[in-house]
Amino acid sequence: AMKPMKKLTALALACALGLSACAGPGGASSHSAPRQDFTSVPPGAGSTQEGAPAQAMRYRSMWFSYLEWPMLDTSSAEAFTASVDTVLDHCVSLGLNCITVQVRPFADATYESGLFPWSHVVTGTQGQAPGFDPLEIMVEEAHERGLRLEAWLNPYRVRNSATNAELSAENPATAMLKTGDAIQYNGAITYNPASKKAQQLIVDGVREIVENYDVDGIHFDDYFYPTTDVAFDAASYAQYQTGGGTMSLTDWRRENVNQLVRAVHAAVKETDPEVVFGISPQGNMENNYDKQFIDVEAWLTEDGYIDYICPQIYFGFDNSTYPYAETVEAWSDLIENDVQLYIGLSPYKIGTEDTYAGSGRWEWANSGDILARQVDTARQAEHYKGFSLFRYDSVFQPQSGVKAAVQEEIDSLKQVL
């Protein structure tokens, strides 16, 4: 299928040649506001007030997760468009310029896919089609408002223990469970990161999105290996050793993820060099390395992995273990290549007790300008290029008990944007 943007180019050409296509209804798309290109901001630009124009170019995104999808009315294309417009208008009103939409939470698709079944978050049942293409509508409506849209997917997760949605018969994981290319563990199902077949499916799934939709980016979050348990992939590791492999289990796991990340990056760039590929790992570096088995340092020193990193620095300034300012600095210091640094921020903590923060456990309950100060602080970091907010509900549909606190935080955040 042709991307809307590519269709537009053809339309523009037709207009230039004076062909009748100009009169067609497709011409309406020319009202689209220009989208910003965040990939070209020079390092350190705009860390002062004089750099205000550069600040405006910074990445400012909102995560819209599968937990938010139920708020969208999927009864018809018209109803869906109206509910999407509300979401996007909220993002614009906050001064954001991007939305990161979860399109593959559970080895499924919130768009027309030849590889994955329709997601249960769209119609309530995996494999059931809504009768229109939600992603196509979201991309078009976002671009009309000058918002970029990134497609966020979970590469390995098929289902977690909390998801009761039945796998549809056509879900590729159904057959792959029988061959060890997908693994059932602790009530959850995950694609086997060591499986070449699973890896290829994930890469093909990314390529399909970039080919068929005018998305501005592909986004992975912090879920990679679901466990540290040696039993999880013991069969695959034994096979690797039998074949003469000498890496330790943990290094081998990290290399499995590295292979996937490199392959996804290559597929994205081959399909459309303008599309970015970024990953949002945990803010806790040790967890990334030892529990998720991701080698972030490789991604931030060698080329060919990612375009941006967006660590989830969901910590306040007074967090005993990971104080915000020092954690941002530590992440910035890791970067030795051209990878852009975005900071994942945690409005979901506003007005609540931060249980594991030690001396900072009441910080989010007692302050009204943490997010604003976090953005200001991040701007001092050498590689900082923007932020993302987790998540839409926490900002625009907060629990009644924290509504006033959220409003206060968002008002102060707007002051620094």
Predicted regions and their residues:
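Substrate-binding cleft of secreted/luminal carbohydrate-active enzymes
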Residues: 303-322, 330-331, 337-417
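Polysaccharide-binding and catalytic clefts of secreted carbohydrate-active enzymes
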Residues: 145, 173-302, 314-315
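Sec-dependent signal peptide cleavage junction
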Residues: 19-39, 47
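The substrate-binding groove and active-site-proximal loops of carbohydrate-active enzymes
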Residues: 67-78, 116-131, 185-200, 246-257, ...
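Aromatic-lined carbohydrate-binding/catalytic grooves of carbohydrate-active enzymes
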Residues: 94-130
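Catalytic domains of carbohydrate-active enzymes, especially glycoside hydrolases
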Residues: 82-109, 212-216, 304-308, 384
